[in-house]
Regions:
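A bilobed periplasmic-binding-protein/Venus flytrap-type ligand-binding module shared by bacterial periplasmic
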Residues: 19, 81-90, 95, 173-188
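Short helix-initiation/N-cap motifs at beta->coil->alpha
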Residues: 30-41, 120-139
């Protein structure tokens, strides 16, 4: 029986699954595509077995989750697709419009506003990802994914949250990783995910060229994003960044506990 693999339907996920889509790596997965928050919900509801979910969801899991070693979606500076868009100084933000597609970015925005910039948030508003509408109803907006990547930044005051996090903490930020219940995937399945990542990183230019055919920028723009802004490893620095993130989220009451990070190989 195929392992149901929850896949985020964003450009930055493509290098992790391109090899599966193109038949370049043997696997036993059924690929199920959704936005990050829905991937997390489907994993929670056991509609998928393993999924690429926002890191914050590891701390909110109904039972301990394990993660696949060595594969994630992270940044070590500007990420170019996770933004806090402002109509006033960060310290003066009182209301925040949230694009609920990604719970990690929502939690990160609150950590940065409250702990780094000293804002006193009074209210958050769930919203569809339309920047102008969001800013009509709030002091700031969280905008993520392909919409953020293609945002005309000259029109707005923008904080790149990946850059703000790393400048503040000196650590990478991990947005998502392959996650599931303890025995949902075996060593062979984990190895397939690692091989798919390695293969995908060799095909970034081809991925970018195919994506550019239906999007406003050229392949060079998208290739630079995938190869420079996004990092797909999950090393010691990334794990330290995750732990710091969980600790801050716990301090703000966004999660009830700081989880232990367990790998499938353990």
């Amino acid at each position: 029986m195929a392992i149901r693999l929850g896949v985020v339907s964003y450009l930055n996920t493509k290098p992790l699954v391109h090899a599966f889509e193109m038949g370049e790596v043997d696997h036993d997965f059924e690929l199920v595509y959704d936005v990050p928050s829905v991937c997390a919900r489907k994993l929670h509801d056991q509609d998928t077995d393993v999924a690429l979910i926002p890191a914050i969801e590891i701390a909110r899991a109904p039972e301990p989750y394990s993660i696949v070693e060595g594969v994630g979606i992270a940044s070590r500076g500007p990420v170019r697709s996770v933004f806090l868009v402002l109509n006033r100084d960060p310290a003066d933000v009182r209301t925040l419009a949230l694009d609920t597609s990604s719970r990690s970015s929502v939690a990160l925005s609150r950590i940065l506003l409250q702990k780094r910039f000293g804002a006193h948030l009074e209210d958050t508003i769930d919203a569809e990802p339309d920047v102008d509408v969001m800013l009509d109803n709030a002091d700031a907006a969280v905008v993520i994914g392909d919409i953020a990547l293609e945002l005309d930044r000259s029109r707005y005051r923008v904080v790149d949250m990946g850059d703000a996090w790393t400048e503040w903490t000196g650590l990478p930020f991990v947005y998502a990783c392959w996650t599931g219940r303890k025995y949902a995937i075996d060593r062979e399945g984990c190895d397939a995910l690692v091989r798919a990542k390695a293969s995908g990183l060799l095909h970034v230019d081809a991925i970018a060229e195919a994506y550019a055919a239906d999007h406003p920028y050229d392949a060079v723009f998208y290739s630079a994003y995938l190869s420079q802004a996004i990092h797909y490893g999950l090393g010691d620095a990334e794990l330290e960044g995750m732990h710091r993130y969980f600790a801050y989220a716990n301090e703000l009451g966004l999660i009830d506990r700081v989880p232990t990070i367990d790998f499938y190989s353990e």
